[in-house]
């Protein structure tokens, strides 16, 4: 970390993670080049998760697709960071953060995923083809399940990137709640690269370069892209703020990403109910779904209670 005798007064500009009198460029001219590269690399892998994440919702719907993908992301994202850090930096003893309480939380999370998966299977077997298409146009449980698991695994690389970039900040000069913001920026840059390459590939494959000249669609596209980006990024800004309040609890700090994903699952299923994706399912199926959601919520807080 940066532990030089820099002024402690904060800047009032938008660079919340950068002390007054310093610039973001100083972070990238440090000896953290390996961490910077690894943080961006896992951002690239996370970008793959983002691409497949959309497909999981296409084939499973918002509720089931997000539940399986984000549940897998929560469990693996929590474990992979310390494991990979221990491989590259054994002197940090990162595995020590994977306490019995944390492992129990992850296991309970995976149980919650399994229960929600059972609810999805029950939905697939109980509805007619017409009902399935009415709820989710391209519903395909086996295909969607495989894609959702892949999306969850790759999306977990976001938290791994944050783990490798944890020290890319100005140390004590940066408030705890802002310390992960530089790493978050690097991970999202890596994800942007993946998505940009894929979009350009699709443009070339489908010969749709001319669509960029259709000025009539630019207004709505830019507006909703900005809105989606702001709303989506706010969760990771909230993650950074939340970690700042959890520094006294190593267990909750390690599980913070898992907690965020669990809350995503809860609200995605609320939207799934609002959008009537579970319309026509038996009461038993709904009960199983709710049980899975409750298990995921419990998994976020159980380790702290043990």
Outline where the language-model segments fall.
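Polytopic alpha-helical membrane proteins, predominantly small-molecule transporters/carriers
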Residues: 1, 9-306
């Amino acid at each position: 970390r940066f532990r030089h005798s820099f002024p402690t007064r904060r800047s009032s500009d938008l660079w919340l993670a950068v002390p007054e009198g310093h610039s973001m460029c100083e972070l990238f001219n440090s000896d953290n080049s390996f961490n910077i590269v690894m943080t961006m690399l896992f951002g690239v892998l996370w970008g793959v998760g983002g691409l497949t994440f959309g497909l999981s919702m296409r084939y499973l719907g918002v509720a089931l697709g997000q539940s399986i993908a984000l549940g897998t992301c929560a469990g693996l994202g929590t474990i992979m960071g310390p494991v990979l850090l221990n491989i590259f930096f054994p002197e940090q003893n990162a595995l020590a953060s994977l306490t019995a309480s944390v492992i129990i939380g992850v296991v309970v999370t995976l149980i919650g995923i399994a229960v929600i998966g059972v609810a999805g299977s029950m939905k697939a077997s109980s509805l007619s083809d017409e009902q399935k298409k009415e709820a989710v146009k391209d519903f395909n449980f086996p295909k969607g399940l495989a894609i959702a698991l892949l999306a969850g695994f790759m999306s977990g690389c976001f938290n791994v990137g944050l783990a490798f970039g944890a020290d890319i900040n100005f140390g004590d000069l940066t408030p705890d709640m802002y310390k992960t913001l530089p790493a978050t920026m690097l991970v999202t840059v890596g994800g942007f690269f993946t998505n940009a390459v894929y979009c350009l590939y699709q443009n070339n494959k489908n010969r749709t370069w001319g669509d960029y000249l259709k000025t009539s669609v630019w207004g709505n596209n830019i507006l909703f892209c900005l809105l989606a980006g702001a709303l989506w990024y706010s969760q990771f800004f909230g993650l950074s703020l939340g970690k700042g309040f959890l520094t006294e609890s190593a267990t909750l700090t390690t599980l913070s990403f898992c907690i965020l994903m669990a809350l995503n699952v809860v609200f995605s299923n609320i939207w799934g109910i609002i959008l009537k994706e579970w319309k026509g399912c038996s009461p038993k199926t709904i009960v199983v779904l709710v049980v899975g959601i409750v298990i995921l919520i419990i998994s976020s807080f159980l380790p702290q209670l043990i």
